Design a protein with these regions (language model features):
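Acidic, low-complexity intrinsically disordered regions
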Residues: 16-19, 116, 138, 252
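Flanking helices and flexible, charged tails adjoining ferredoxin-like Fe-S electron-transfer domains
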Residues: 2-79, 86, 340-404
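A residue-identity detector for tryptophan
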Residues: 20-23, 120, 142, 150, ...
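Short linear sequence elements within intrinsically disordered, low-complexity coil regions
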Residues: 38, 53, 69, 82, ...
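Short N-terminal secondary-structure initiator segments
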Residues: 58-98, 144-179, 234-250
Length: 404
């Protein structure tokens, strides 16, 4: 009981700090932004928030302009006659360090990822955009954020003094998975916690990570970007927070270490290794059953578990030939080919192009809504087709080799 009370007090302090930081840092920007909107003017973000460290000589600058070289289209089933335009209501006169540089685009050696957005550090290179994002939240969005903050109070905590022995890690794994599903998870898997999953700001020393997914409301997702879609996503993230906290507490009650890891943790690499799906061209995970209609959560632990394996459902072959997300993205932020990022070749979304549109519209998510895999019932067919095509290519290559 005392542990729960201390956690509740910590949660109240966290919400108070967040609310005060939000109010004091963004009230002038919020007021001036509304005034500028009424006048039809752009607001200059350089005039707000704490100073941002200038990029060093030779470091690339952020370019927030959209990519106009890509053909545009709009999926007929999205709930918009047209997507919101890319005529932004703000500007930055002194460009800061590129978000792609922070992300490690073009780097051939591995390094841990670095925090880049949703940091609450407004002196960060992308801090001006984040300050605006926080400033223009609607009251409903702000309440939703506070509810999420409340859930963080039980992300960590004290473990029971007596440890439950685990003689059969396989049986324990099934129990933990069943409990996670009982709490509302649609997908769950276990992976070894590797260096690809941690950030410089949150080093973790656990052997395992439990990765899970909460299903998204597809109808709301098809309304993106909108307040409805944003509030629905916040509610879904609140669900991942609650499940993460409860599973972590359940493990700690057995005398083992466990920590809910939501912020500053690389959810997608963990989910890939746990067998939940594959990374798609739009930068999100694709699952055969759910497409990209889910939100991820994770728990790091030393509880002895049996790990799952990555899956191959044909996403890499499919995305190499598909253009749906690249052409539906209004600022065209999605690279059509894989990029080298921190020593790994992978699909990548241009952060400098994506995030201004995300901020302007209080969020986005068009790319995962239009993804063909997200249409119910199509995933298995896509997998079968890709595997058949792959087999034909292999047979053709073998025949050509024999005839050479």
């Amino acid at each position: 009981m005392l542990v729960r009370i201390r956690q509740d007090i910590r949660g109240l302090k966290q919400i108070s700090r967040t609310s005060w930081r939000h109010w004091t840092s963004s009230r002038k920007l919020r007021r001036d932004f509304r005034t500028a909107q009424k006048k039809g003017e752009k607001i200059v973000l350089d005039d707000y928030g704490p100073p941002v460290k200038k990029p060093e000589q030779g470091q690339p600058l952020a370019d927030f302009s959209p990519n106009l070289d890509v053909k545009s289209r709009k999926a007929h089933f999205m709930n918009h006659d047209e997507y919101p335009t890319i005529d932004y209501s703000f500007e930055v006169k002194n460009p800061t360090l590129s978000g792609n540089y922070i992300n490690g685009l073009g780097e051939t050696e591995f390094r841990p990822a670095r925090e880049i957005f949703h940091t609450w550090k407004f002196d960060h290179p992308l801090g001006k955009l984040e300050l605006l994002f926080q400033a223009i939240r609607t009251p409903k969005e702000w309440v939703a954020l506070c509810k999420r903050q409340w859930n963080t109070r039980r992300f960590t905590g004290e473990k029971a003094a007596v440890q439950v022995p685990v003689d059969d890690p396989g049986a324990m794994t099934e129990k933990i998975k069943a409990y996670t599903v009982e709490l509302g998870s649609a997908l769950v898997g276990v992976a070894p916690l590797t260096e690809d999953m941690v950030t410089e700001e949150l080093p973790l020393d656990y052997p395992y990570v439990i990765s899970f997914a909460v299903k998204m409301d597809r109808d709301a997702a098809l309304d993106a970007p909108s307040e409805l879609a944003g509030l629905t996503i916040q509610a879904e993230y609140r669900g991942t927070d609650q499940i993460s906290a409860q599973v972590a507490q359940h493990i700690r009650d057995m005398g083992w270490d466990a920590e809910a890891v939501i912020h500053n943790f690389m959810q997608i690499p963990a989910a890939v290794e746990a067998g939940l799906g594959e990374l798609g061209k739009h930068g999100s995970l694709i699952n055969q059953e759910l497409g990209s209609m889910f939100r991820l959560g994770a728990i790091a632990t030393n509880l002895p578990l049996v790990t799952d394996s990555p899956v191959d459902i044909g996403v890499q072959d499919f995305c190499a030939r598909c253009q749906v997300c690249t052409t539906n993205c209004p600022p065209h932020a999605i690279f059509d080919t894989k990029q080298m990022v921190r020593g790994r070749e992978r699909w990548y979304v241009n952060f400098d192009t994506c995030i201004p549109y995300f901020v302007e519209n209080h969020g986005c998510g068009i790319c995962i809504g239009v993804c063909p895999w997200s249409e119910p019932g199509r995933g298995e067919g896509f997998t079968l087709k890709q595997m058949a095509l792959r087999k034909k290519r292999a047979e053709r290559a073998e025949a050509e080799a024999e005839s050479a």
